[in-house]
Structures are given as structure tokens and as C-alpha cells.
């Protein structure tokens, strides 16, 4: 991705700060990003909070009021998932990076990181899981299959945008309001930021879209664009932000 970005640098994003930047645009509602079927072992599970649904509906109306044409739904026909368990490249990548640090590094492998115990206990399970098995580099069959899947995923997103003449997709960033300190019931469920942008490699930007729980807990909306469309996304996000002014700084106590 870094190599492919050569020659695409934008000198300044200041020109993207246009208050009426949503006028004349076409925005697709990517409902499949957050409207999920409950798992078979828990068919009554709530997969998106009603407050989020309500706030997002208002956000769509706000986009319309700011001059955007809404395409709803805008569905992406995704490719079948890569087979073989996916690319488990973390162990390879971290060990390869630590080699470049030489004697300056206090640790030289993922094994040594785990043995040191110098990390937050909450990530121990992930570190140990990543350390199992043979490191998979970019030339491994699993990582090649994963790279091919990501390319196909990005092509599917682009095709939908081309077919529907979209400037961006939008969807709730999270399907649930923020948890309060000490709350653990929801865990990390409902994070909608881990699929469409990471798997396609395309840019996305998050903007405040309003409040839930009696106007107390914030909610965000993600705008997903084409490859290299950062300037266009900033223009859309800025126009939406200026039209709604949802951001409310928390009081300092």
C-alpha cells in the first residue's frame, strides 16, 4: 500500500474544507455493514441497538438536508472468504521487524516478548495465539490467498460504487453505544470498523452523528470511499460536521 501511494500525495487537505461539500453527491447506505443475522446459538440476540438505528436514521435525513442524494440500500456483492484459516502474519512481521533493530532492541522475537511479561495482561491470549505455529510471511500460501481476497474485496466495493455512481458509503461505526466504565456485558461486539475499510484497503473517516441514551452517549458514522479518495472523504465529513455540529466536548473534571 505504501509503495502504491507514490505519486498520489496531496499537498494540502485544506481545499477539502467546503461547507456545502455534500451538495450533489450520492451517498450509499451500506446496511450489510451493521444489519447482521443473530448467531444460530442465540437467535434472540440484539445485533444493533435501537438507539443507534434511530440516530443513524436521523443522520441519513441530515445528509439529505445537506444536499446529498441517498441510495438505500447500496449492497456490495462480496467475494467468498479466503480458504485455509487466513494469513497469520503477526509472528512473522514482529520477528522480522525486531531483526532490524539489532542489539538496540530489548527483545528480539515474539517468544521473548511473551517471556518478558512486559505487556498488559488483557492481550496475553492474543500474543500466545499469534505465537503458535510457523510464522507466515507474504510468500506463504495462506497470505497469498488473503492478499487475493483483499484485492477481490476492493474490486467488489469499487464495482458497487461505479454501478451506483456513489461518492461514498455510510454506516454506523459501532452498533452499540459506548460502554460505561466497569461495563463488560457487550464486550467488543458491534464494531463495524473491522471489515470494509481494512479488507479493501480503502480510506474511511468517522464523524459524530448524534447521541444515544437520552442524549448522553455519543454515536459515530463511518464514511467509506474509493481508493485514494481521502480528500473527497474529508470534504464530505467536513460538510456533514458543519451542518450538524454534533460534537460536544466532554466537561473537564
Predicted feature residues:
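Short, surface-exposed loop/helix-turn segments at secondary-structure junctions
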Residues: 44-45, 141-142, 176-195
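Acidic helix-start/capping segments at beta-turn-to-alpha-helix junctions
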Residues: 74-87
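Short helix-loop capping/hinge segments that flank enzyme active sites or metal/cofactor-binding pockets
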Residues: 16-42, 88-158, 206-220
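Structural helix-boundary/capping segments
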Residues: 1-36, 45, 57, 62-64, ...
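Small-aliphatic-rich amphipathic alpha-helix that forms the alpha element of a beta-alpha
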Residues: 78, 184-208
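General small-molecule cofactor/ligand-binding pocket signal
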Residues: 69-74, 205
Amino acid at each position: 500500500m505504501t509503495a502504491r501511494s507514490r505519486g498520489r500525495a496531496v499537498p494540502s487537505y485544506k481545499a477539502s474544507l467546503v461547507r456545502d461539500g455534500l451538495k450533489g453527491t450520492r451517498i450509499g447506505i451500506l446496511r450489510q455493514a451493521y444489519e447482521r443475522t443473530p448467531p444460530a446459538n442465540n437467535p434472540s440476540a440484539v445485533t444493533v441497538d435501537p438507539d443507534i438505528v434511530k440516530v443513524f436514521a436521523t443522520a441519513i435525513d441530515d445528509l439529505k438536508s445537506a444536499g446529498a442524494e441517498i441510495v438505500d440500500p447500496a449492497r456490495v456483492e462480496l467475494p467468498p472468504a479466503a480458504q485455509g484459516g487466513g494469513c497469520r502474519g503477526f509472528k512473522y512481521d514482529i520477528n522480522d521487524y525486531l531483526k532490524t533493530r539489532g542489539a538496540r532492541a530489548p527483545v528480539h522475537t515474539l517468544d521473548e516478548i511473551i517471556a518478558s511479561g512486559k505487556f498488559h495482561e488483557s492481550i496475553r491470549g492474543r500474543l500466545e495465539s499469534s505465537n503458535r505455529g510457523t510464522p507466515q510471511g507474504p510468500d506463504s500460501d495462506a497470505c497469498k490467498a488473503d492478499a487475493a481476497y483483499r484485492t477481490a474485496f476492493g474490486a467488489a466495493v469499487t464495482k458497487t460504487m461505479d454501478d451506483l455512481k456513489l461518492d461514498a458509503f455510510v454506516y454506523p461505526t459501532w452498533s452499540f453505544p459506548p460502554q460505561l466504565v466497569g461495563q463488560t456485558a457487550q464486550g467488543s461486539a458491534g464494531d463495524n470498523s473491522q471489515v470494509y475499510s481494512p479488507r479493501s484497503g480503502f480510506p474511511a473517516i468517522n464523524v459524530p452523528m448524534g447521541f444515544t441514551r437520552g442524549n448522553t452517549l455519543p454515536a459515530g458514522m463511518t464514511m467509506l470511499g474509493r481508493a485514494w479518495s481521502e480528500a473527497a472523504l474529508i470534504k464530505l465529513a467536513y460538510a456533514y460536521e458543519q451542518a450538524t455540529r454534533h460534537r460536544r466536548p466532554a466537561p473537564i473534571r
